[in-house]
């Protein structure tokens, strides 16, 4: 395993203030938040969410930032309306049984295949936070991955085999937290070794003073978290800007 299974920290977070500018549509059978005016035949970013799903305000604000940078952005509901909420009790084991990797992979694969078939974008970037990172990695695989580049933050559930399967021509940006038992130092180092061995194009950034989840739902009233969260988004935009033009 390149990152451990999701844990309690994956179900904790802070909601950020702001008014989303995008719109909700049914796209390829999934409730989807769409942002941007760029043609979907040009540059597209698909955001694969954590367990908070595609109605959580934070991810919508993030999508708007990507849209402002010139991308058509889609945030599909890969949880089929079963996102968790901080103010409601949750049986984590039961939730993960409903949203196993096998179940979620079919949902993500279906959306990506139809996106490619319908629009055939010139560039597809895929972003994955925590739970969603596994499926982002799968879509830069040399075995059927449909994205051109990926950016993931504090990943969970990613296997070493999925890291090894990454197409060396498809770049991956990994943003990691210093305090993270889901993606701890030993698994970070193992991930680096595999990427290096496979001659992958990669960048791995480690942020001090932050914990798992910081890029998606961190408490931005804390200066270190605010800096790291904002820096990750800037890095992701720069990453996709660069690799969509090479």
From Swiss-Prot:
GO cellular component assignments: cytoplasm
Keywords for this protein: Cytoplasm
Gene Ontology molecular function, alphabetical: hydrolase activity
KW Cytoplasm (keyword) present: yes
Main location: cytoplasm
Pfam families: DLH
Other comments on record: Present with 1800 molecules/cell in log phase SD medium.
Protein name: Protein AIM2
């Amino acid at each position: 395993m390149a990152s451990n299974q999701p844990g309690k920290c994956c179900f904790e977070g802070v909601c950020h203030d702001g008014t989303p500018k995008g719109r909700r549509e049914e796209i390829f059978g999934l409730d989807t938040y769409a942002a941007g005016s760029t043609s979907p035949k040009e540059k597209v970013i698909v955001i694969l969410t954590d367990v908070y799903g595609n109605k959580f305000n934070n991810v919508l604000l993030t999508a708007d930032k990507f849209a402002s940078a010139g991308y058509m952005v889609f945030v599909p509901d890969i949880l089929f309306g079963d996102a968790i909420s901080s103010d409601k009790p949750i049986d984590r084991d039961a939730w993960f049984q409903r949203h196993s990797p096998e179940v979620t992979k079919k949902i993500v694969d279906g959306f990506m295949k139809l996106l490619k078939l319908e629009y055939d974008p010139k560039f597809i970037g895929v972003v994955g936070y925590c739970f969603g990172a596994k499926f982002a990695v799968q879509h830069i695989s040399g075995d059927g991955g449909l994205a051109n580049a990926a950016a993931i933050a504090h990943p969970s559930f990613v296997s070493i085999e999925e890291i090894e399967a990454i197409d060396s021509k498809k770049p991956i940006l990994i943003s990691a937290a210093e305090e993270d038992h889901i993606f701890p130092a030993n698994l970070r180092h193992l991930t680096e070794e595999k990427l290096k061995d496979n001659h992958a194009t990669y960048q791995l950034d480690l942020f001090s003073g932050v914990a798992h989840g910081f890029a998606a739902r961190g408490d931005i009233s804390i200066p270190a978290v605010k800096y790291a969260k904002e820096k990750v988004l800037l890095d992701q935009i720069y990453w996709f800007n660069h690799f969509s033009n090479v």
